[in-house]
């Protein structure tokens, strides 16, 4: 069976390790390399993420092994109010629970847009061709659009609606973020060029949002120092 693959890429450490893992699995064959896709929804941090991704792709293990980052648009600012924290760039604070950053329908948007793009980019309709959408969800994700049932059902829906054979793969679904970090170290991922922040500025993490706290805790659990720059050091 011919298998095409695309990685849903955000510029964060999870998707960076996921892409590095997929490149390693491709064995250096450019034709087998996954297609990195970034879906822009109109959120405040997206320009920073894409700028950092360009720097990341200039470094091993990505340089020369993967093509440019494909940037797609699926703007939701006509759905969310102008005062929404993701639009204004005023994210939940450091100690708030993960549930506070939930963006309804986020994974539906990402997978739908990725499927539409890959259906056109990989035009074969052969029954022996499969398109894999690689998604970096982790263990313990509390949201309804991050369950195994959701991903299986979504793949079935995309396959039916686009007359392709889609599968959504979640290789890290049983892993904690600290385990992903350790795997990334083995693969040589330059974590200083990954961005896991909802209020970044000039390539630096804010150190104040809950995503910065999550990243700090994961590096501590992994027994490693986070090499990324911060505007404020998350000390709590």
Each model region followed by its residue ranges:
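Iron-sulfur (Fe-S) cluster-binding segments and ferredoxin-like electron-carrier domains
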Residues: 201-204, 210-235
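C-terminal end-of-chain micro-motif
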Residues: 1, 235-236
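ATP-dependent adenylation/nucleotidyltransferase module used to activate substrates
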Residues: 1-188
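Immediate flanking context of iron-sulfur cluster ligation sites
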Residues: 186-206
